[in-house]
């Protein structure tokens, strides 16, 4: 606008000068105008071209809106996960506080009455069982918290990628492509705050640093297990058609993949883990320890019926094992692994349990293997729990060793003890998951599996 006025002023001055000279002489006036830069788009498109460009813009806008809706759905899912993480974190802290109170109460009562009678010992055993139940619940809650932590990180990463893609598309649409008009930026959905994800991880680390760290499970997600020790961290396939007589029958029918199978034991159908690849397959897993997620310090009825999940830590049950081993001659295989990754095996060429009327007494054959024989000392002994004491010791071995087993006076092995993290542990009693001939009684093993199958002729 200022440039136009300047030109007009120059023209008026020239006309005034010409008139002042009386118009006697004719002058030729040449105006030199500086070139001006265009400040707005110059449209040379025809109506058909404009319609085509408008259709292209609408198509791109539609794709933007579709991406935005997907991003908003992700944000909603992330918000729900964030709420669940907050609730689980609060629950974990509450469980941790309760667990500390139970431990303090247990230690106080143990110091107050060192020589326990039958009734106080049973009461103390129940108190210890409650403490271990609280520990197992805390471990499960923390594992769930870490799983949600991983999901939150994944969602945050995906949403960041979507936001970056939307930004690139917006910049491309806003560029000077054939005189197109600029597209207004789309509003982006807010990302899941990384501070929340970090706080979940910090909570998990705080649980690992509790004074009783030896009792806490490994909170890192287990990687794919070795073929030596079957575990439930792998995806469980659909169960083959059953129920089967035993895992060997399923293996003989062509089901060679390890997983959960249904076995018919008497009038019951029981879900078990069949190990179909270890040493020829056909093995029924009757016990597994791997992460401390299940409390094995429990009573007679639980040990009789079984507890845990076949794809994770579990005890098949004394009665189901009796039913399995009463169907012909069976062998027993025990697989062990320490915290350094060293594996060992113990094999017994015959194995069975007597019925409940004989307290599920253990019957073993000859030992073979490289783990050392730490179970034959328990041969011909009845099963004992904290509420059914049938060992040869004047006290209660199940109370001191924190788990049911075929105790003598008391034990050279106990694979049903407390799962301590890291191997060597400090405890008033020898109550870890141990095999005396393999790493000793003061070392709690990382993994232990007991398997049985029909003897193959």
From Swiss-Prot:
Q: Where in the cell is it found?
A: Secreted
- Report the coiled-coil segments: 51-77, 126-164
Any transmembrane segments, and where? none
Where expressed (tissue)?
Highly expressed in the liver, specifically in hepatocytes, and weakly in the heart. Expressed in hematopoietic cells, platelets and mast cells, and detected at wounded skin.
Q: Which domain of life is it from?
A: Eukaryota
> Mind telling me which GO cellular component terms the entry cites?
extracellular region; secretory granule
Q: Provide this UniProt record's keywords sorted from A to Z.
A: Angiogenesis, Coiled coil, Developmental protein, Differentiation, Disulfide bond, Glycoprotein, Secreted, Signal
Locate the compositionally biased regions of type Basic and acidic residues. 205-218
Residue span, Fibrinogen C-terminal domain: 238-456
Q: Where are the residues of the annotated region Disordered?
A: 201-235
Q: Give the signal peptide, or none.
A: 1-24
**Ranges of Polar residues composition bias in the record:** 219-229
Identify one Pfam family in the record: Fibrinogen_C
User: Which pairs are disulfide-linked?
Assistant: 247-274, 397-410
The protein's recorded glycosylation sites are 202
A GO BP term here is: blood coagulation
| Biological function | May play a role in the wound healing process. May promote epidermal proliferation, remodeling and regeneration. May promote the chemotactic activity of endothelial cells and induce neovascularization. May counteract high-fat diet-induced obesity and related insulin resistance through increased energy expenditure.
Protein name (Swiss-Prot/TrEMBL): Angiopoietin-related protein 6
- Please report the organism this UniProt entry assigns to the protein: Mus musculus (Mouse)
Encoding gene per record:
Angptl6
